[in-house]
Amino acid sequence: MLSPRRTKFRKQQRGRMKGLASRGNTINFGDFGLQATEPCWITSRQIEAARRAITRYVRRGGKIWIRIFPDKPITMRPAETRMGSGKGSPEFWVAVVKPGRIMFEIAGVSEEIAREAMRLAAQKLPIKTKFVGREEEYN
């Protein structure tokens, strides 16, 4: 699972996901990509599940790039704990994804294989996504 090696602070505020992605919204490495059309937190487990789905389908051919990284710690309180006594401990890591963000890229395979691989990956993610080629992008 993906997570930062070390961070400046252990805990972060939740924040908001307003607007479209201004960075990471174009295909830079591969030929085809999977683009988010909704804002969401994507956990490191979901990223790993999507990555496995893509690699299983394309087998030996093609190269895959993961364009999102879970760098935000999400804290949780233990079950049946009273209010107060501070913020909970970090439980898992998420990547903040805004609409328009390219999450995965793939190269070295045909469009049919890439489309099916991205469809399988999209089923592992909690948001609506869009398959894009190098020429057509969201913003």
Curated annotation (Swiss-Prot):
Organism field: Gloeothece citriformis (strain PCC 7424)
Pfam family, one: Ribosomal_L16
Known role: Binds 23S rRNA and is also seen to make contacts with the A and possibly P site tRNAs.
One cellular component (GO) term of this entry: cytosolic large ribosomal subunit
Gene this protein is translated from: rplP
Presence of the UniProt keyword Lyase in the record: no
SUPFAM superfamilies: Ribosomal protein L16p/L10e
GO annotation terms (biological process): translation
A GO molecular-function descriptor: structural constituent of ribosome
Highest taxon of source: Bacteria
Protein keywords: Ribonucleoprotein, Ribosomal protein, RNA-binding, rRNA-binding, tRNA-binding
Annotated NCBIfam families: rplP_bact
InterPro entries cross-referenced by the UniProt entry: Ribosomal_uL16, Ribosomal_uL16_bact-type, Ribosomal_uL16_CS, Ribosomal_uL16_dom, Ribosomal_uL16_sf
Family: Belongs to the universal ribosomal protein uL16 family.
Subunit structure: Part of the 50S ribosomal subunit.
Disulfide bond annotation, renumbered to this chain: none
Record's protein name: Large ribosomal subunit protein uL16
